[in-house]
Regions:
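Flexible, acidic/Gly-rich N-terminal and inter-domain linker regions that tether
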Residues: 1-146, 481-485, 492, 500, ...
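C-terminal non-catalytic accessory extensions
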Residues: 2-3, 420-495, 499-529
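Long, compositionally biased intrinsically disordered regions
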Residues: 6-10, 281-285, 376
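Canonical Radical SAM [4Fe-4S] cluster-binding loop centered on the CxxxCxxC motif
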Residues: 146-183, 234, 526-527
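Short acidic, glycine/serine/threonine-rich loops at helix termini
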Residues: 166-168, 214-215, 246, 375-376
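C-terminal accessory regions of radical SAM enzymes
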Residues: 347-460
């Protein structure tokens, strides 16, 4: 319902009519029959009773997964037939609800591209990997990924309601033989129990919301019994593939385990249905904050205007756009990949052009296991020791004067600085800024630069390159500052230049340094600074 239709409906209802109905709320919108709005159904399910259609177990049991199933509802292309006929294809399963959203006659339908295999899935591409994020490298026990200091990813199932063709975990997802047994799930919990730095657990898979309610609750209860686990998150596409699953019983169970957060996965505005709006409304009313993680996909959402429509519709149903991921280098996803520049173009078209709440972070999940790297357009043009030069989304260029009397934060007197949460082995750049170390060496750096020298070298003394007052590498204690030969404690010289007493200017009163003849005037070129 657009703004014109809402205005007309309000006028028709009359000013004195009660009770008030919020026609802007997507979860309360009505269809032509005056009943809650619903999405279309494919013709083969037109006569299915509503009580069956709205039963999530029925939706799971009636999923389409073969060429013969899908040609009942879609006019398949030769490319799709090739993909569906491949013996080693990634699993196919599509709920009746989700396949009904597809235009049966449009081979480029954006929902269709996400769930129907094509022949190009079978082609390898440069950089392709089975586990492009190296999750299994960061896995202390099967199904648990500990990549970041204070949080873990807990995979509790390999099953989903439907299967995305670009799935980053296609190496295990959809394969019932890869499911995690009770012993492995207990090992995941035991690792979390003995690792007190873990304060945040993300439940994923597969999709945890496909589990039987008792199994899901057992996992949640196990986590809530661990005192140092502060928040639990769930990553799920069930509200999108099968919104019927989000019923009162599930929401009542989830809210027992607060604080609880949930991220859904919507890629295109065509997925924004009345059913999804009502599912998200139920979750929000259960006190669960909602976010959205989407993937940038060629032929689906690689368009600024599609993305702007999507994020605006998401915030309307109280779902905050969280991440938009660059497509991973996984098997079967080559035809979905876009240049990173396309993602930057999309963020450029969102930031400033729509609400800040509607702008997600653009993320490249580093191949090889480097983790999530946020990428964004550059709004910092230049800087000096006293100001920065910035530009906004319109190209407006401005400067921000840095303060001249800033008193740095007193780390020695700060209880938080003196008692930080432990991040063993993962301080990274923060460790450099905190002064805990002065550089980061890549693996093999020392061996490479030894240049094969195996004998004692009279000039080589490792103590020469250990900085005073700083631990050069993580875990090293900083050496105390020495007393220099001048008798003064080591430290800054105050900025005095050689040949100039106490930093006095080398120029006379009123004089300025002049550029050499024929050279451009640097002051003119940097007048903003």
């Amino acid at each position: 319902m657009d703004a014109t239709e809402i205005t007309a409906a309000v006028a028709a209802r009359g000013a004195d009519e009660a009770p008030f109905v919020n026609l802007r709320d997507p979860a309360k919108r009505l269809g032509p029959d005056g009943q809650p709005a619903v999405s279309r159904r494919a013709r083969i399910w037109e006569d299915v009773p509503d009580e069956k259609w709205n039963d999530w177990r029925w939706q799971l049991s009636k999923r389409l997964n073969t060429l013969e199933d899908l040609e009942q509802v879609l006019n398949l292309t030769d490319d799709e037939r090739e993909g569906l006929s491949a013996p080693d294809k990634f699993r196919v399963d599509v709920t009746p609800y989700f396949v009904s959203l597809i235009d049966p006659d449009d081979p480029d339908d954006p929902i269709r591209r996400q769930v129907i295999p094509v022949g190009s899935e079978l082609r390898a591409f440069t950089g392709m990997m089975e586990d492009s994020l190296a999750e299994d490298r960061h896995s202390p026990v099967p199904g648990l990924v500990h990549r970041y200091p204070d949080r873990v990813l807990m995979l509790i199932t390999t099953q989903c309601a439907s299967y995305c063709r670009y799935c980053t975990r296609s190496r295990i997802v959809g394969d019932a033989t890869q499911n995690f047994n009770r012993r492995e799930l207990e090992a995941q919990l035991e690792y979390i129990r003995r690792t007190p730095q873990v304060r945040d657990v993300l439940i994923s898979g597969g999709d945890g919301l496909t589990l039987a309610p008792k199994l899901l609750e057992s996992a949640l209860r196990g986590l809530r019994e661990i005192a140092h686990v502060e928040i639990i998150r769930i990553g799920s596409r069930v509200p999108v593939f099968m919104p019927q699953r989000i019923d009162d019983e599930l929401c009542e169970m989830l809210q027992k385990y607060h604080p609880m957060w949930l991220n859904i996965h919507v890629n295109h505005p065509n997925e924004m249905t009345p059913e999804l709006a009502r599912a998200c409304d139920k979750l929000s009313r259960a006190g669960i904050p909602l976010g959205n993680q989407s993937v940038l996909l060629a032929g689906v959402n690689d368009c600024v205007h599609i993305q702007r429509d999507l994020v605006q519709k998401l915030v309307e149903i109280r779902v905050r756009p969280y991440y938009i991921y660059q497509c991973d280098l996984v098997e079967g996803a080559g035809h979905f990949r876009t240049p990173v520049g396309k993602g930057l173009e999309i963020i450029e078209g969102l930031r400033g052009h729509t609400s800040g709440y509607a702008v997600p972070q653009y993320i490249v999940d580093a191949p090889g296991g480097g983790g999530k790297i946020p990428v964004m357009p550059n709004y910092l043009i230049s800087y000096s020791d006293h100001k920065v030069v910035l530009r906004n989304y319109e190209g407006y260029i401005t400067t921000y004067e840095e303060p001249t009397s800033y008193t740095p934060h007193d780390r020695a007197g700060c209880a938080w600085c003196q008692n930080p949460r432990p991040e063993p082995g993962q301080e990274g750049i923060t460790g450099l800024l905190d002064g805990k170390k002065m550089w980061i060496e890549p693996a093999g750096f020392i061996e490479t630069h030894a240049r094969g020298n195996e004998e004692a070298h009279r000039l080589q003394d490792p103590s020469k390159w250990v900085p005073y007052g700083v631990g050069a590498l993580e875990g090293q204690a900083g050496q105390p500052l020495p007393v220099l030969q001048s008798g003064a404690a080591g430290g800054d010289t105050g900025g005095a230049s050689a040949g100039s007493p106490s930093g006095a200017s080398a120029y006379g009163p009123g004089e300025e340094p002049r550029p050499a003849e024929g050279q451009p005037n640097a002051t003119a070129n940097h007048e903003l600074l």
